[in-house]
Curated annotation (Swiss-Prot):
Belongs to the bacterial ribosomal protein bL9 family. The lineage of its organism: Bacteria, Pseudomonadati, Pseudomonadota, Gammaproteobacteria, Moraxellales. This is Large ribosomal subunit protein bL9. One of its GO terms (biological process) is translation. GO terms for cellular component: ribonucleoprotein complex; ribosome. The keyword Protein biosynthesis does not apply. Gene3D superfamilies: Ribosomal protein L9, C-terminal domain (3.10.430.100), Ribosomal protein L9, N-terminal domain (3.40.5.10).
Length: 164
């Protein structure tokens, strides 16, 4: 089945491309989600009429993602968690925890945008975490995990000194 993509889809294609997909994927996912149209001559004409509008929407999303990436530059998130003597956490810090901490600090981040390629964080320490704001735009933040009985103020002062 051939479809016209109405937005960029990872591992499939970009806006406006006509691609071959399995019939079930096209009928049951891409078309109902509004991500593609069947590649009929009538739909090709409709798409060409809307191409500029769709490209403008994509450009706006890209600009918004760039703006959010600038806001996330040099962000240091300090989190506290219970841990044992050796620094191993009781539990773990995951994408939801990091997204919630960023949201509390005034930066709107969805948990699906937080990327932890090595899995959840299970040790006290500093970690660089990527935030994927758009297909091609990533922001890197520093997440510092302290023991719950650790001194948060000292860690904040240390982070400020490192930034200077």
């Amino acid at each position: 089945m051939q479809v016209i993509l109405l937005q960029r889809i990872v591992n499939l294609g970009k806006l406006g491309e006509t691609v071959d997909v399995k019939s079930g994927y096209g009928r049951n996912y891409l078309i109902p989600q509004g991500k593609a149209l069947p590649a009929t001559p009538a739909n090709v004409e409709k798409f060409e009429a809307r191409r500029a509008e769709l490209e403008a929407i994509e450009a706006e999303e890209l600009a918004a993602a760039n703006k959010r990436a600038e806001a996330l530059t040099d962000v240091n998130v300090i989190m506290r968690a219970k841990s044992g003597e050796d620094g191993k956490l009781f539990g773990s810090i995951g994408t939801r925890d990091i997204a919630d901490a960023l949201t509390k600090s005034g930066l709107e981040v969805d948990r699906a945008e937080v990327k932890l390629p090595e899995g959840t964080l299970r040790q006290v320490g500093e970690y660089n975490v990527d935030i994927q704001l758009h297909h091609d735009i990533f922001a890197s933040i520093l997440v510092t995990i302290l023991s719950e009985d650790g001194d948060v103020e000292a860690a904040q002062q240390e982070a400020e000194e490192d930034a200077e």
